[in-house]
Amino acid sequence: MRPLLLSIVAIALCACHAAPEEQSVKPGINTNFLDPNLEVDKYVERFETESREVFAKRTGIARAIGLEPGMAIADVGAGTGLFVDFFARDVTAAGRVYAVELSPKFVENLRARAARRNQPMVEVVQCTERDVSLPAASVDAVFTCDTYHHFEYPAATLASIRRALRPGGALVVVDFERIPGQTRDWLMKHVRCGKEQVIREVLAAGFTLEEEVPLGFEENYFLRFRR
């Protein structure tokens, strides 16, 4: 058999045995955030209020990440920018904060916000449903807060996060507990999986679990993984 034909056969065989593309774990979970008429101010009122646990504990959460001047961090699912100011302060002008967002309206707001606050270290990134859209080995840490349960394609998204992290980099996941009989009904319906499943998925993506940081949460948890 000629070399060219052998190559074609080999390619065809590989294609036949290629892994199927990951299916959505919860179709439509991000539809509201993709609305071109999304009203950002309403989400600011909803996300940035003392009645939201992660807002009330925002200072402790930011401190627990352990950022230092000159480091680079990606806030995946940056939303209204709740943690961006903390990260910009901690990494200083010598560092970099990537505010990563799927929602076009949040992206627009984050860019205007960084300009108003004179934060040249903040770079806003429009991501996709499968990829955080960051350069390889570009960050020391990736942070997600009440965002992991919005990963519609978690395996693909985690693979892109792992590519973006430098060796030894940290992935911090802050998200809702999902405990039958304890978690509020709306969270049981909204959040697709509990902490144990999140850990399984992140470990399967090639990370190691370093610790769960106790911050006095009632509805959330803080997990630190390493690349």
Regions found by a protein language model. Give the residues of each.
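C-terminal motif of bacterial Sec signal peptides marking the signal peptidase cleavage site
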Residues: L13-A15
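A short acidic, Gly/Pro-enriched loop at the edge of an enzyme's catalytic core
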Residues: V132-A141
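Core SAM-dependent methyltransferase catalytic element
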Residues: E211-R227
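Class I SAM-dependent transferase core
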Residues: H17-A74
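Class I SAM-dependent methyltransferase SAM/SAH-binding core
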Residues: A74, A78-D131
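Conserved class I S-adenosyl-L-methionine
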Residues: V172-Q197
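A short glycine-rich, Lys/Arg-flanked "PGG" loop and its adjoining helix->strand segment in the class I
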Residues: A155-A170
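Hydrophobic beta-strand segment of the Class I
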Residues: I73, V142-F143
